[in-house]
Amino acid sequence: MTTATTVKTEYEAIIGLETHCQLSTKTKIFSNSSTAFGADPNTNIDPVCMGLPGVLPVLNEKVLEYAVKTGLALNCQIARYSKFDRKQYFYPDLPKNYQISQYDLPIAEHGWLEIELVDAEGNPSRKRIGITRLHMEEDAGKLVHAGSDRLSGSSYSLVDYNRAGIPLVEIVSEPDLRSGLEAAEYAEELRRIVRYLGVSDGNMQEGSLRCDVNISVRPVGRKEFGTKVEIKNMNSFSAIQRAIDYEIERQIAAIEAGDRIIQETRLWEEGAQRTSSMRVKEGSSDYRYFPEPDLAPIEVSNEQLENWRSELPELPAQKRHHYESELGLSAYDARVLTEDRSIAEYFETAIASGANPKAAANWITQDIAAHLNKQKLTITQIELTPTNLAEIITRIETGKISNAQAKEKLPDLLSGISPEKAFAGLELITDPTVLEPIVDEVIAANPKELEKYRNGNTNLKGFFVGQVLKKTAKRADPKLTNELVEKKLNA
């Protein structure tokens, strides 16, 4: 894991994240237009998301379900009664000149999630980060600036309204984060959770997960917050960490130089690896919120709440704790296995089929992971079933095949060949009466090496073991072979 940039000890950073997460519904939040990514510009639009006169929004019930499930997964209090509000501002990507959002009565609030940081020795430490609120809203359109990645410097701008009306939840953290590393881990854990829930794909490159950072610095020991600066335009977790680390140093340098920190929005410039001023930050009063008159208040019944709660899967943090405390896995292995729900399910199916948990973890996080990375595949795309992986591990542990044989046959196994077929005729020779004559034959055939060994070159033991394995096409049991070779050489 990336380590954090060292911050001068006389200052501390106060960091909070506002995360916009697109929900994976088939249609938009208030209309029936598709939410599919990558469509031609302005093809997934309709009168509602374009704000044409005379049309009325209707809430997509799936959006409410996904928002409540996310709130429950984040340990939030779910509001039995909430409402939508109009957030008013004027920008080309907002066709109605207002955004339907939630203001004073969000669907969920007062939650938390736990982040886990692993040090260089592999020891985990955990920290609880508060969640202020989670609310539903509609996304805006997307501006494309010709000749620049921002309005300034572009010759003209185009607007794609396909994104307008796509459902979002905005998740606002408490200012409990203290470094770029903590913030990046918080965002990663948030993505793991929404992916486990199946409510979002969390794809930062496609804009499904967008994080804005609020950051200030203050002298250690001071209770008052410094002036808050917002940072936008970070499209990866590493960019979040680098942007925060840069901004911490920038603000500290400004304070020490006697400059005033102004409340503003700054843009992270990936190429230059710096933040630059974008606009003076607006306050909430600038948006002139008022209740949305075209949508009825939202009521969540006890039955809905309990049904949705019962459908929650075991979440990443719960799985990590289970893997470490009950299965004896390392913090690193538990983290890798729970990074993706399909990998965790593959692992759990393998151990349910009889695989040793540590052996299964090693195979999945090492050999299988290497294959997935090389071929750019997911674990659901390989033909090696978790049941067959369990059988392979059992064959190794019972001495029927060696670990080396299994690794050699892994490409065949990954392509769908069964363990029975892959290891046919390759069972290990474990009978000493069969293996001993072969060892005698190898030693007799190499008198010069035998003499060198007995004159002190004990490293040649590996040579004799290798010759036995070669002569038996690697079918000789490695442990038994080592024992017999050592016994014969020292006779």
UniProtKB/Swiss-Prot annotation:
- Cross-referenced HAMAP family: GatB
- Per UniProt, the enzyme's principal EC class comes to ligase
Any single Pfam family the record assigns to this protein: GatB_Yqey
PANTHER family with a match to the protein in the record: GLUTAMYL-TRNA GLN AMIDOTRANSFERASE SUBUNIT B MITOCHONDRIAL AND PROKARYOTIC PET112-RELATED, GLUTAMYL-TRNA(GLN) AMIDOTRANSFERASE SUBUNIT B, MITOCHONDRIAL
Q: What protein name applies here?
A: Aspartyl/glutamyl-tRNA(Asn/Gln) amidotransferase subunit B
Q: Which family is annotated? A: Belongs to the GatB/GatE family. GatB subfamily.
What keywords would UniProt list here? ATP-binding, Ligase, Nucleotide-binding, Protein biosynthesis
- For whether the record's keyword set contains Ribosomal protein, the answer is no
> Which superkingdom heads the taxonomic lineage of this protein's source?
Bacteria
* GO molecular function term, any single one: glutaminyl-tRNA synthase (glutamine-hydrolyzing) activity
Under the heading SMART domains, the entry gives:
GatB_Yqey
Keyword Transferase in record: no
Q: Look up the record and give one Gene Ontology term from the biological process aspect.
A: glutaminyl-tRNAGln biosynthesis via transamidation
Q: What is its EC number?
A: 6.3.5.-
Function statement: Allows the formation of correctly charged Asn-tRNA(Asn) or Gln-tRNA(Gln) through the transamidation of misacylated Asp-tRNA(Asn) or Glu-tRNA(Gln) in organisms which lack either or both of asparaginyl-tRNA or glutaminyl-tRNA synthetases. The reaction takes place in the presence of glutamine and ATP through an activated phospho-Asp-tRNA(Asn) or phospho-Glu-tRNA(Gln).
The record's InterPro entries line, in alphabetical order, gives:
Asn/Gln-tRNA_amidoTrfase_suB/E, Asn/Gln-tRNA_Trfase_suB/E_cat, Asn/Gln_amidotransferase, Asn/Gln_tRNA_amidoTrase-B-like, GatB, GatB_C_1, GatB_Yqey_C_2, Gln-tRNA_amidoTrfase_suB_CS
What does the record give as the reaction this protein catalyses? Answer: L-glutamyl-tRNA(Gln) + L-glutamine + ATP + H2O = L-glutaminyl-tRNA(Gln) + L-glutamate + ADP + phosphate + H(+); L-aspartyl-tRNA(Asn) + L-glutamine + ATP + H2O = L-asparaginyl-tRNA(Asn) + L-glutamate + ADP + phosphate + 2 H(+)
Q: Quaternary arrangement and interactors, per the entry?
A: Heterotrimer of A, B and C subunits.
